[in-house]
Regions:
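Divalent cation-coordinating acidic motifs and surrounding scaffolds
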Residues: 1-344
């Protein structure tokens, strides 16, 4: 089974759906639209997400979060970009649910309203990590303008900024989320995790709909974005061919479409990444994490094939599907996933 014990490092991905710690003032949200106002704390979303991390995901050593909003939620034009309060509230909720005290890390956007998503929210990726189990490699944290690069750290892969964003100034990420990379040490081994939230599939038409060929919204953007992350992995492997790299997040893509083939390296035959669903042979019926136009893609955590032993997405550990009828207010638009890696 999968658990944060002994030599097994556990890594999870969780889209937390515009999580923020405040009840917005309707006068300060986009178009003064009451639909932009929410109360994630009062509605129990922090507690529910924390409970899933503790019980369903069994307190992973590292949790990659997507759609973390800033401290003022959807309020606009207030100069707020940090998500320290949002992450702090989630860390406390996990403690209240019986979990460990995680350390949260993020790189806030350099300029407000440049990451897309709900106006004012400035969504970004972040990591939670259990410092009792893993160590964030010492270094300089990047800013929203800094681009982190793999570098040689005594024979293993380090990062020029840790944590850091990957090419935040590249036009491929204009109006979209920038990949967040972080390097950790576990049991004397280095692991680099890349947390993504690629451009949405907005504007898509159903695969089997009346419009053929179907429209895959923003596919061109995702092709460019995945190529950049693929190059980052290539650069890491050029430093250490046996590097432990995990690429996870909300890919907003079907596994059979070109952007994820580019990400994995299938288009250039480098094949640097493998889909964990394929590596572990998880049943096809369990490979759903999201319902889009009647189809069930996955956020697709990926691993470098050289990563040791048997990484395995936790089908049995995953919480109930967020769109099940007994959950009228989804805590996440995606099914969270966790994976285990034997690192002796």
């Amino acid at each position: 089974g999968i658990g944060s014990t002994g030599n097994q490092l556990t890594v999870a991905t969780y889209n937390v759906l515009n999580l923020d710690p405040v009840v917005e003032n309707v006068a300060n949200v986009d178009d003064m639209d009451a639909g932009e106002v929410d109360d994630d704390a009062g509605d129990g979303r922090f507690a529910a997400i924390a409970n899933q991390i503790v019980t369903a995901l069994a307190t992973p050593d590292i949790v990659g979060l997507q759609e973390v909003q800033d401290n003022s939620g959807a309020e606009i034009n207030d100069g707020v970009v940090s998500a320290s309060d949002t992450l702090g509230a989630l860390v406390q909720a996990i403690v209240d649910a019986g979990g460990p005290t995680y350390t949260a890390i993020e790189v806030a956007p350099a300029v407000a309203e440049t990451n897309g998503g709900q106006p004012g929210g400035n969504i970004r990726q972040a990591f939670l990590y259990n410092a009792a189990r893993v160590t964030l490699v010492a270094g300089t944290a990047g800013t929203g303008n800094d681009s982190t690069l793999p570098q040689n750290d005594a024979g293993v892969v380090g990062l020029s900024f840790n944590p850091g964003l990957i090419e935040p100034g590249n036009t491929a990420f204009a109006g979209a989320r920038k990949p967040l990379a972080a390097a950790f040490d576990f049991n004397g081994q280095r692991i680099v995790v890349v947390n993504n939230h690629f451009s949405s599939k907005g504007g898509s038409t159903p695969i089997n709909g009346a419009i053929q060929p179907f429209v895959n919204g923003s596919e061109g953007e995702r092709r460019a974005q995945t190529a950049i992350v693929n190059q980052f992995v290539d650069d890491a492997l050029a430093i250490d061919a046996n590097a432990n790299v995990v690429v996870l997040g909300d890919m907003n893509e079907f596994t059979f479409e070109e952007p994820l083939q580019i990400l994995a390296g299938a288009d250039d035959s480098s094949n640097v990444l493998s889909d964990l669903f394929d590596v572990t042979g998880l049943d096809q019926l369990e490979r759903y994490t999201f319902i889009f136009n009647g189809n069930s893609p996955a956020p697709d955590p990926l691993s470098v094939p050289a990563a040791p032993a048997t990484p395995s997405p936790a089908g049995a550990l995953s919480p109930p599907h967020p769109h099940s009828p007994n959950r009228p207010v989804p805590h996440s638009p995606h099914r969270p996933l966790t994976s285990g890696y034997e690192l002796p």
